[in-house]
Amino acid sequence: MRYQASPALVKAPRALLCIHGAGCSPAIFRVQLSKLRAALRENFEFVYVTAPFPSSAGPGILPVFADLGPYYSWFESSSDNNHNGPSVSERLAAVHDPIRRTIVDWQTQHPHIPIVGAIGFSEGALVTTLLLWQQQMGHLPWLPRMSVALLICPWYQDEASQYMRNEVMKNHDDDNDSKDTEWQEELVIRIPTLHLQGRDDFALAGSKMLVARHFSPREAQVLEFAGQHQFPNRPRDVLEVINRFRKLCVTAQTLE
């Protein structure tokens, strides 16, 4: 499936990779980000990726977005209770494929508009986190350098942390002295990030755990807002998000 860019004429100097939530779609994510897109339209193009697995509608999607299906998710649900399903590495390979194809399509058609950051919502925010971490670890040579990220109501599973720990420990099997110090530092992402957390979000506890475990306190900003599992909708909250993200982009040198 080819990438889906902002429908308006491409004219911004840089682009952001947009990774929607579970049971969602690029069309829905475009609507969810409409206020942010409007504020940043002169600065960024928004490049949307479609998740690999067809699924039912996710939380909060129906009935509002009943006409914007079909819906997709990043991780295929499994009823296997014997733990014989695909490993995290195998599932990430399925996640990487549509993202890589989207990036290649964008770079081919818009070689002078680099992708410099990412926006992820819910399950897409967890995917974004894993992409950022894998890139920091020297993997994913096909992924453009991610300099900034906005994570909206991240969904979290401890399985992701365990995967990261296992990958790090592979490099420290013979280094006992570093197991309690250096290797833990390798689990922390060190790029400017803004984390939006709805106070009434069912995923709030996991969102807090994700930023505490895997993002540098010096680089990560957390903004709580009055709301549930959604992009903020109160005007003052929206303005705060826009202002903070702009400043973050300046810090990351993705915005002048």
From Swiss-Prot:
GO terms for biological process: lovastatin biosynthetic process. The active site is at 122 (charge relay system), 201 (charge relay system), 229 (charge relay system). The keyword Disulfide bond does not apply. It comes from the Eukaryota. It catalyses: dihydromonacolin L-[lovastatin nonaketide synthase] + H2O = holo-[lovastatin nonaketide synthase] + dihydromonacolin L carboxylate + H(+). Disruption phenotype: Strongly reduced lovastatin biosynthesis. Low levels of lovastatin are released due to complementation by other esterases. GO terms for cellular component: cytoplasm; nucleus. Lovastatin acts as a hypolipidemic agent that works as inhibitor of (3S)-hydroxymethylglutaryl-coenzyme A (HMG-CoA) reductase (HMGR) which reduces HMG-CoA to mevalonate and is the key step in cholesterol biosynthesis. Lovastatin, simvastatin and related compounds are widely used to treat hypercholesteremia and reduce the risk of cardiovascular disease. Furthermore, statins such as lovastatin were found to be anticancer agents. Its EC number is 3.1.2.31. GO terms for molecular function: polyketide synthase activity; thiolester hydrolase activity. Pathway: Polyketide biosynthesis; lovastatin biosynthesis. Keywords: Hydrolase. It is an enzyme of class 3 (hydrolase). Belongs to the LovG family. Esterase; part of the gene cluster that mediates the biosynthesis of lovastatin (also known as mevinolin, mevacor or monacolin K), a hypolipidemic inhibitor of (3S)-hydroxymethylglutaryl-coenzyme A (HMG-CoA) reductase (HMGR). The first step in the biosynthesis of lovastatin is the production of dihydromonacolin L acid by the lovastatin nonaketide synthase lovB and the trans-acting enoyl reductase lovC via condensation of one acetyl-CoA unit and 8 malonyl-CoA units. Dihydromonacolin L acid is released from lovB by the thioesterase lovG. Esterase that catalyzes the release of covalently bound dihydromonacolin L from LovB during lovastatin biosynthesis. This is Dihydromonacolin L-[lovastatin nonaketide synthase] thioesterase. It comes from Aspergillus terreus.
